[in-house]
Amino acid sequence: MTSSTEIHTGDIGEALCYYRLLQMGVPCRIVNLGATDILAILDDDVVIRVQVKTAHQTFDPRYKNRSAFYGFNVCRGSKEKRRFLEHEIDVFACVGLEDEAIIFYQAKHLLQKKTHKVKAHLFSDSGVTQDSWSKAIKPLLYT
């Protein structure tokens, strides 16, 4: 069973992602429909299905140089983990809560994984949200 803390964290991540997309001028809506958390509409005819994953910053205690990272669960299910399928989503939004920043990825780059670790310092770049969104959607606009 998913804890209320995990649900709360996920809701905050979705709200932050929605807010950042609107700040960037991207028309979107929170939908929570199947595998899709947010629908973004580009150029009035391209629909982008976004799956939002949210994490808190953590450290790996096994190493002396404990650099902070975010660990994202990029699959579905609270007990039995199942990978998303390519036809279900277009973009993953990995939300780093402490930095209030997002790194977007084309879904196909993370579909074969169950977890995805990102060094926390990558979220501190002021342009990371805009830059990663542009990079993630570019191939979807020209297919």
Regions found by a protein language model. Give the residues of each.
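Mixed-charge (Asp/Glu-Lys/Arg
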Residues: 1-34, 40-143
